[in-house]
Amino acid sequence: MRGLYVHVPFCLSKCPYCDFYSERYSRALGERYKEAALRNLRFYNERFDTVYFGGGTPILLAREIVGILSEASLTAGAEATVEANPCVSDEERLFLLFSGGVNRISFGVQSMREEELRFLGRRHTAKQAENAILCAYKAGFRNISADLMIGLKNQTKASVSESVRALSSLPITHFSVYLLKIEENTPFFRDGVGVMNDDEAAELYLFTAEFLEKSGFCQYEISNFARTGYECRHNLKYWRCEEYLGIGPSAHSYYNGKRFCAARDLNAFLKEERQEITVTDEAAGDFEEFAMLRLRLTEGLSFADCARFGISAETLLRRSEKIPSEYLRVTESGISLTARGFLVSNALIGRLLGY
């Protein structure tokens, strides 16, 4: 069954490292956005088992999100996620979301150290992040995720472990860990902000992965860790090459065998009967794409899956012979990358694909 992604492109302010499409939040636009999203959704006679509201800062439109959910066709037990910034995650919004059908909340915490939060241009403090998480739990959420940013210049293992300890003492069930990357057309890029060198960043990534594992969060994807049973079902669709529909400015879709994206234009989305899309791949889902996505997961690539594409286990094993075991696991049923292998995944995947 397909998943639904809804891009909510509103923020109070733009973080200096972020290159996702967003516009300044205006309460007056909320109702218009909801109607545009529903208008587009009605073009598809679909039932979804996951829905993910990403942004932007979707929680700003809590009431509108509940309105969209009330009209969307979801299966019983569907996973419904909303991304949230701790500084606007008040009791009213969180209770409204949970009572309206949202059962998973993802907080953009990034760090529990004040100096790192200031550097990243975040509007919240560590205390606000803690309060937001506890408030979400009080509202009824039992599936709570936190984003963590690593690779900041001068960041240390001690500072990362401080953030992980602080967050894992709270009712968190999931972590997404991202290495800071300086993207073009961001203030960090224009200001020449530096990041850790590759070797330091790799060492910090491996440390963080190990520390999270010891704290009870199992790695299931390059950047994602979860307590047992709390993996993000929606995001697993991306990595398992399953189809999903994207609604909203800049939203991407994999639908009916094609990949396409919506225009990065809020005004057009609000005005037009149907969102403008650009097809990026007419025949998505070939073996190369499938393998690249599956090898992001610790479950890896099974020989049975390869056989569906006409790739034999013998071919894959032959290509993997010279890859050291510290980078690649080989079992009777398939292959997968280790945490160290994830750091050089592009090179390893290229070798496995026969490049």
Regions found by a protein language model. Give the residues of each.
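Immediate flanking context of iron-sulfur cluster ligation sites
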Residues: 1-8
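Short, flexible helix/strand-to-coil boundary loops that buttress conserved ligand/catalytic motifs
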Residues: 19, 121, 349
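Short amphipathic alpha-helical interaction segments
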Residues: 310-324
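Minor-groove-contacting beta-hairpin "wing" of winged helix-turn-helix DNA-binding domains
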Residues: 334-338
